[in-house]
Swiss-Prot record:
It comes from the Bacteria. PANTHER family: 3-ISOPROPYLMALATE DEHYDRATASE SMALL SUBUNIT, 3-ISOPROPYLMALATE DEHYDRATASE SMALL SUBUNIT 2-RELATED-RELATED. Pathway: Amino-acid biosynthesis; L-leucine biosynthesis; L-leucine from 3-methyl-2-oxobutanoate: step 2/4. This is 3-isopropylmalate dehydratase small subunit. It catalyses: (2R,3S)-3-isopropylmalate = (2S)-2-isopropylmalate. Catalyzes the isomerization between 2-isopropylmalate and 3-isopropylmalate, via the formation of 2-isopropylmaleate. It comes from Geobacillus sp. (strain WCH70). One of its GO terms (molecular function) is 3-isopropylmalate dehydratase activity. One of its GO terms (biological process) is L-leucine biosynthetic process. Keywords: Amino-acid biosynthesis, Branched-chain amino acid biosynthesis, Leucine biosynthesis, Lyase.
Length: 197
């Protein structure tokens, strides 16, 4: 994973609640275990008509949202079945952060474990961001170090994140990387407490 410290990027909004993981990445695309190649299937049933032609009415297909790296959505984002493919698809598409009033717990944790930053903001703040996201080239800056989200027009909010998860994201580590960092201590512990016969 790459470290997440400060990110400034274009915002795309999907003003829908209860977007489930099957809408994020439909089940027929879950047959692979690589983390890449899922972006083209993100929101597949909404993005394409008959699986081929881009749907001009879907938010991410609008020209002003091309290149967006921050997604804003409504309540209960990522509900439904647990699948790591959902954050993989969002990342592979180009998103680095998701902002919503609430997330399904399992999806929220899957995002953090895979280096995608989920940010909870108050409903009225998300509504403001959804309105602003309809403007061409609307951008937000996210500072994980300061736990702040802000734009160039004076909007600024702080957000909460578990300190442990924050440190992993800042360093670009997953839990396997953390195990490697502590490997000498683990080996020493095993040597003291589990001697070989």
């Amino acid at each position: 994973m790459k470290p997440f410290t400060v990110h400034k990027g274009k915002v795309a909004g999907i003003d829908r609640a209860n977007i489930d993981t099957d809408q994020i990445i439909p089940k027929q695309f879950l047959k692979r275990i690589e983390r890449t190649g899922f972006g083209k299937f993100l929101f597949y049933d909404w993005r394409y008509i008959d699986g081929e032609k881009p749907n001009p009415d879907f938010e991410l297909n609008r020209p002003e949202n091309e290149g967006a790296t921050i997604l804003v959505a409504n309540e209960n984002f990522g509900c439904g079945s647990s699948r790591e493919h959902a954050p993989w698809a969002l990342q592979d598409y180009g998103f680095q952060a998701i902002i919503a009033p609430s997330f399904a717990d399992i999806f929220y944790n899957n995002c953090l474990k895979n280096g995608l930053l989920p940010i909870r903001l108050a409903k009225q703040d998300v509504e403001y961001l959804l309105r602003e996201s309809t403007k061409a080239d609307y951008e937000l800056t996210i500072s994980l170090e300061d736990q702040r989200v802000y734009d160039d027009s004076g909007f600024e909010r702080t957000f909460d994140i578990d300190p442990y998860r924050k440190q992993l994201l800042l360093k670009g580590w997953d839990e396997i990387d953390l195990t490697f960092v502590y490997e000498p201590y683990i080996a020493e512990y095993e040597k003291k407490h589990c001697p070989m016969s």
